[in-house]
């Protein structure tokens, strides 16, 4: 029996990288997965990977910067699979600028995708998590099961990162949201935790080519490697496994935790 057998999970930013790895890993462990990404091509590719392995998924291209889109996504997932048990708030982008060059447009964009989407998706999940637990408490005195919310923050919120004032502010906001929701939702047996990846091999950390919006200079990549005790960059699957642990019954007494997945990176 899989560690998430019979559970229904929503994973945002699931078209690539950490989100895709998490959605696939959850499906391998028995969860039905709502695969959310604003890019329909990558989202459908993730669903195809899940389906090829015998798993169940539903693709959603909802742009959860809008609350209504988040509500529609959760409703569709509950209609398709009967419930919502797990939320993985993973959607994120970087748009790097030194602070004196940072404008409102880039500030708002990065805060929207990294933080506002997490607020909307989690808020839209309350009827399926908190309200479901309240009904169980009214009937029996206690919630029937633990339900789970996880976030992807970043080790950059701990260390700071030159050129990423918008990104680190958003990821710091995720930490505050995680710890506050852990307190608010704990009485309903809803565990709320976050994973803080270090340097993970994704398109956001690939060597930046001239004209690219994302990626980082190769010199910075090599400097980052020198700070990692385990001597390698992380892979999306490393982070997916952390989300899986926190979403599983093995973590039923863990809440409000920020779990670094950084290979012993200095400062984490």
Named regions from a protein language model:
Residues 159, 242-244, 255-268:
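Short C-terminal tail/terminal secondary-structure segment
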Residues 186, 191, 254-256:
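Short, small/polar-rich loop/turn modules that mediate ligand/substrate recognition or access, typified
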Residues 197-207, 211:
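Short, flexible catalytic-loop segment of classical short-chain dehydrogenase/reductase
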Residues 98-99, 103-111, 224:
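Substrate-binding pocket helix/loop in short-chain dehydrogenase/reductase
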Residues 154:
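Residue(s) in the substrate-gating loop at a strand-loop-helix junction
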Residues 40-41, 61-73, 104, 237-238:
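The beta1-alpha1 cofactor-binding region of Rossmann-like NAD(H)/NADP(H)-dependent oxidoreductases
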Residues 122, 170, 178:
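Active-site helix of classical SDR
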């Amino acid at each position: 029996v899989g560690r998430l057998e019979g559970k229904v999970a929503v994973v945002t930013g699931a078209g690539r990288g950490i989100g895709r790895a998490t959605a696939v890993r959850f499906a391998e462990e028995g969860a039905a997965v709502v695969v959310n990404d604003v890019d329909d091509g990558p989202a459908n590719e993730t669903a195809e990977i899940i389906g090829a392995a015998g798993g169940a998924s539903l693709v959603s291209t909802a742009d959860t910067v809008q609350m209504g889109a988040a509500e529609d996504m959760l409703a569709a997932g509950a209609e398709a699979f009967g419930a919502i048990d797990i939320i993985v708030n993973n959607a994120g982008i970087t748009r790097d600028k030194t602070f004196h060059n940072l404008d409102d447009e880039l500030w708002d964009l990065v805060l929207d995708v990294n933080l506002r989407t997490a607020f909307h998706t989690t808020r839209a999940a309350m009827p399926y998590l908190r309200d479901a637990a309240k009904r169980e408490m009214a009937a029996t005195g206690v919630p029937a099961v633990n339900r789970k919310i996880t976030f992807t923050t970043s080790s950059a919120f701990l260390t700071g990162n030159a050129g990423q004032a918008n990104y680190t502010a958003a990821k710091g906001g995720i930490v505050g949201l995680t710890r506050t929701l852990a307190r608010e939702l704990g009485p309903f047996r809803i565990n709320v935790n976050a994973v803080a990846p270090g340097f993970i091999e994704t398109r956001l950390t690939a060597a930046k080519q001239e004209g690219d919006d994302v990626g980082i200079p190769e010199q910075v990549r090599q400097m980052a490697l020198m700070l990692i005790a385990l001597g390698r960059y992380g892979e999306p699957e490393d982070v997916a496994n952390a989300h899986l642990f926190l979403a599983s019954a093995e973590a039923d007494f863990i809440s409000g935790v920020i779990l670094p997945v950084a290979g012993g990176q200095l400062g984490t």
